[in-house]
A protein has these predicted regions:
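Acidic, proline/glycine-enriched N-terminal capping motif
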Residues: 1-101, 109, 234
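Conserved, structured C-terminal
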Residues: 1-35, 41-45, 119-390
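Membrane-targeting and insertion segments and their boundary/processing signals
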Residues: 52-56, 106-113, 139, 193-197
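Acidic active-site catalytic centers that drive phospho-/nucleotidyl reactions
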Residues: 64, 113, 208
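A generic structural motif
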Residues: 74, 104-106, 325, 367
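Internal amphipathic helical hairpin motif
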Residues: 76-110, 164-192
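Well-ordered mid-protein domain cores that form the structural environment of catalytic cofactors
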Residues: 88-142
């Protein structure tokens, strides 16, 4: 039966796009704006995605990531409460240390990925833009009686990334040089009180800076005045994170993928696994625990598919959604992210493949416009990380 309702009923108007505190600055800088996560965001500036990507890999790039959600969890029970929603060690996280985490559902699927930093009196949490309203509701519903869940819509978020990021930021406050990867602290930058973590989404050394919205443009201009720094859009952010082998939520991980399938078991600390002092106790713990146990016993990681990196010596980029087949043409998986890797000048991709084909060096084929593109399962990241660990 065909649906004719669309022809007779006017479509509901799309919700107007939100803007970040740097929107006017993006326009001034000549950005090409696109919708992303409900916001009007810069996808690139005049120099283009390739130049922006390479500049970030060699110097320093400034990204507006204010569309992401920032939340404070406050109260003596906050860490233990958060552990009921994530398979991650939060209780033992040291002061001003940061950790990657995952919200899971009852099936072991991933509701979102997030960053958690323990500060003196709270947990500072950053979640993805497209998920932030549901994440805040999730926190309030499940742990809102155990701790205070405080969204921070009045805070902007900037990311300064690249090997020269520390040089540029240290001109505003030399103390930031004391931070190492996945740590944070309170710093005054250009006269503005900020919370800074040494982390990011590019595979490079860099910083993420939470700043009051009303002073975000002042800080952005101070950073752009540094000779190493250029503004970078979401297009290069995507190619940078892909080369770094980092997942994009809603593409490489989602509610149908478990952390084991997503090759994210490194994010589940021993204390939260079977035999650990605080094993389980989070949504989907039975599913994820069983997959971990089977993997430990050599049963193909306990899953039938797994996320891997793919690299090709051919020139044709392989995009999200491309089917992956074996030498006989039998389907074995699908690409979830793909692009030319500007740093290595070869097509790279993330894909879920049958575990029988996930060994490093396995040759597979991506189907692009009915043509088979030879690809090889490769170790991640595709480009060495530049994180500063001290």
């Amino acid at each position: 039966m065909s649906d004719t309702s669309a022809a007779s009923t006017p479509a509901a108007p799309a919700a107007p796009l939100l803007t970040t505190p740097l929107h006017a600055l993006h326009i001034e800088l000549g950005a090409k704006m696109v919708p992303f996560g409900g916001y009007d965001m810069p996808v690139q500036y005049a120099t283009g995605i390739l130049a922006e990507h390479r500049h970030t890999r060699t110097a320093a790039g400034l990204f507006d990531v204010s569309h992401m959600g920032q939340v404070l969890l406050t109260g003596d029970d906050a860490a233990a409460a958060l552990e009921t929603l994530v398979p991650v060690d939060i209780v033992d996280l040291g002061p001003f240390k940061q950790r990657y985490a995952l919200f899971t559902n009852a099936q072991g699927g991933i509701l979102d990925d997030l960053m958690v930093t323990r500060r003196a009196d709270d947990l500072f949490v950053v979640v993805n833009a497209a998920c932030k309203q549901q994440d805040i509701a999730h926190l309030q519903q499940h742990i809102g009686t155990r701790c205070t869940v405080q969204p921070l819509p009045e805070q902007a978020l900037l990311a300064l990334q690249g090997p020269q990021a520390v040089t540029a930021l240290a001109r505003l406050n030399p103390e930031v040089q004391k931070l190492v990867f996945m740590t944070g602290g309170h710093f005054t930058l250009a006269g503005i009180g900020c919370f800074v973590t040494r982390s990011g989404y590019t595979g490079e050394d860099g910083f993420e800076i939470s700043v009051p919205s009303g002073q975000a443009e002042q800080l952005a201009r101070a950073l752009l005045a540094q000779p190493e720094v250029l503004p970078i859009g979401l297009g290069a952010r995507d190619t940078l994170r892909l080369e770094a082998g980092l997942c994009l939520y809603g593409h490489d991980i989602d509610t149908t993928t478990t952390p084991v399938e997503g090759a994210l078991t490194w994010a589940i600390q021993k204390v939260r696994r079977a035999g650990g002092a605080r094993a389980g106790g989070y949504p989907g713990a039975d599913v994820i625990g069983a997959q971990l146990a089977q993997g430990a016993n050599g049963v193909q990681g306990g899953v039938s598919r797994k996320r891997v990196g793919l690299i090709s010596t051919e020139r044709m980029p392989v995009r999200e959604g491309a089917q992956v087949v074996d030498a006989a043409g039998a389907p074995i998986g699908r690409v979830t992210s793909g692009s030319l890797g500007p740093s290595i000048n070869q097509p790279v991709a993330l894909a879920y493949l049958a575990t029988s084909h996930t060994a490093i060096g396995t040759e597979v084929f991506a189907v692009v416009r009915d043509k088979r593109v030879a690809m090889t399962v490769a170790a991640l990241p595709f480009v060495p990380n530049g994180y500063f660990r001290g």
